[in-house]
Amino acid sequence: IYMQLNNETAAEVLTEMDEDARKDFLDILPSETIAKRFVDYMDSDDAVDIIREMDEDKQEEILSHIEDIEQAGDIVDLLKYDEDTAGGLMGTEMVIVKENWSMPECLREMRIQAEEMDEIYYVYVVDDEERLRGVFPLKRMITSPSVSKVKHVMRKEPISVHVDTPVDEVIQTIEKYNLVAVPVVDSIGRLVGRITVDDVMDEVREQAERDYQLASGLSQDV
């Protein structure tokens, strides 16, 4: 059936499959097919979830077949993080602007970056060292004078999480502040990724499934 789907739809269906069924399906596919038919059309966080399910040899084979070198590099970096932390859950698809840019510069760069994304949750503002400085609401961009600098209209001190923050705390942060996405920073405050509410809901669902399976196993043992 998947052969009848276009690449984007096939990739989306794969991410929504039951984990065990997905692994059985991927085990019979060549690494090149997995890379070019699915991974090439996924966000980085979804691709990492898929590749984590493979053994190390197959992981390396899949990565070698990814044509976009930048995407492959992002996936390799994300695989280094513990999957139970913010780093293991985050994706790298973001719109990022510099705090000293003018509104016209900001708009130009946003258009370029947005072409590669399905959805834009927030525009993140960084300094010259890539440290997170603020969040840029789209409404402010529309209403601000063109001579304004981003740093003068951005929302300062945004809520963020660290790459090592446990997933449970990430979920609590998103719920507490009613966020649709939260930026992820490293030990020196550099912006390295973002976690969306959809990512969190997927994690909550997976945790519930694991808890159910554990409870079912315990009840059978009693």
Language-model region placement:
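Conserved structured catalytic cores and adjacent interaction surfaces
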Residues: 222
